[in-house]
């Protein structure tokens, strides 16, 4: 049976996958089929805010909740799930960063190029905290084993 931290980390992973898919597809949509932009009018600022608020920020909040729920030590599979979530964020935002120069200037606005960098930094922070939690939990288990001897 899985505990609450594992379920929340799985939720974070699911949101990260959804965010990655939405961001990559949205940025490719802004490039357009022939590189001239989308064939229909779209408000890129509104769509980007919607994508971030539906899946990007909730993924980060759920990851932070997992760290808050861990009292003394982290479970190995929970931290591995969080590291996978962070890797998905980092890799997908690296792909988005490579797509940004191809976007038509008519659809370009100030935050369009900054958002991927924010989520790369967030992914690095999640991976670092998860690795720290994993290392701390190993040390915690060792000290308990030493006390039982």
Predicted regions span which residues?
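Hydrophobic alpha-helical membrane-insertion segments
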Residues: 13-21, 81-93
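Generic alpha-helical transmembrane segments
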Residues: 46-64, 89, 123
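Hydrophobic alpha-helical transmembrane segments of integral membrane proteins
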Residues: 85-109
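Transmembrane alpha-helix entry/boundary detector in multi-pass membrane proteins
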Residues: 7-14, 30-56, 80, 112-119
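Alpha-helical membrane-associated segments of multi-pass integral membrane proteins
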Residues: 5-12, 103-147
């Amino acid at each position: 049976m899985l505990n609450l931290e594992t379920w929340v980390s799985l939720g974070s992973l699911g949101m990260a996958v959804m965010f990655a898919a939405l961001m990559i597809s949205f940025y490719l949509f802004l490039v357009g089929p022939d590189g001239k932009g989308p064939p229909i009018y779209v408000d890129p600022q509104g769509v980007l805010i919607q994508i971030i608020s539906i899946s990007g920020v909730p993924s980060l909040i759920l990851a932070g909740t997992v760290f808050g729920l861990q009292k003394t030590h982290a479970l190995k599979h929970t931290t591995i799930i969080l590291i996978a979530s962070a890797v998905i964020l980092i890799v997908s935002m690296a792909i988005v960063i490579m797509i940004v120069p191809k976007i038509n200037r008519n659809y370009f606005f100030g935050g369009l190029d900054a958002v991927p960098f924010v989520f790369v930094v967030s992914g690095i922070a999640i991976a670092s905290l998860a690795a720290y939690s994993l290392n701390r939990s190993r040390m915690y288990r060792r000290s308990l084993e030493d006390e039982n001897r």
